[in-house]
Swiss-Prot record:
Its main location: cytoplasm. It comes from Streptococcus equi subsp. zooepidemicus (strain H70). Keywords: Chaperone, Cytoplasm, Ribosome biogenesis, rRNA processing. SUPFAM superfamilies: PRC-barrel domain, Translation proteins. It holds the Pfam family RimM. It is found in: Cytoplasm. This is Ribosome maturation factor RimM.
């Protein structure tokens, strides 16, 4: 079965079985809603167990979750550092022009059919995502995911076409 990362348990929260999660999903309300089923993986990416979300709330930059049947700190202490993942078949369908992070990371980036590099990470600093492009012999390039920069994404071909606006590449 194929799984995709949606968050990491960074600590416990109080004594009632709540955990602090750093989410890496654009769909936190959906991923962590009551009744959602996720898989736990340890720090060596080994499957630990499947869990069901009992509750979810936001607190500062964290998502605070509780698993069904685990209502005390002693039951969840062991999960600190674990990754939360969703099975591929539980991912919902996206609208045209929307993508999951795992579909974008690893794609090759081209400007006018010239290879720029490969997307290695996606940042969420504010209004728009920023795609981090790893380049040969140059510093990483930060590309905002906006229509004037990202001209096209072809998941099947593993390709992103961009127009690097003046000022985005400080190594030119």
């Amino acid at each position: 079965m194929e799984y995709f990362n949606v968050g990491k348990i960074v600590n416990t929260q109080g004594l009632q079985g709540e955990m602090r999660v750093l989410s890496v999903s654009d769909f936190t309300e959906e991923r962590f809603q009551k009744g959602a089923r996720l898989a736990l993986f340890d720090d060596k990416d080994r499957f630990v167990q499947e869990v069901e979300i009992a509750s979810h709330r936001k607190h500062k930059q964290f998502d605070i979750i509780k698993f069904k049947g685990m209502y005390h700190i002693n039951a969840i202490e062991q999960f600190k550092g674990c990754s939360l993942k969703i099975a591929k078949e539980h991912q919902g369908k996206l609208a045209e022009g929307e993508f999951y992070y795992h579909q974008i990371i690893g794609l090759e980036v081209y400007e006018k059919d010239q290879l720029v590099g490969q997307i290695k990470e996606i940042l969420q600093p504010g209004a728009n995502d920023v795609w981090v492009v790893k380049r040969q012999s140059k510093r990483d390039l930060l590309l905002p995911y906006i229509p004037s920069v990202v001209l096209g994404v072809d998941i099947e071909k593993g390709r992103v076409d961009v127009e690097i606006m003046e000022g985005l590449d400080d190594e030119d």
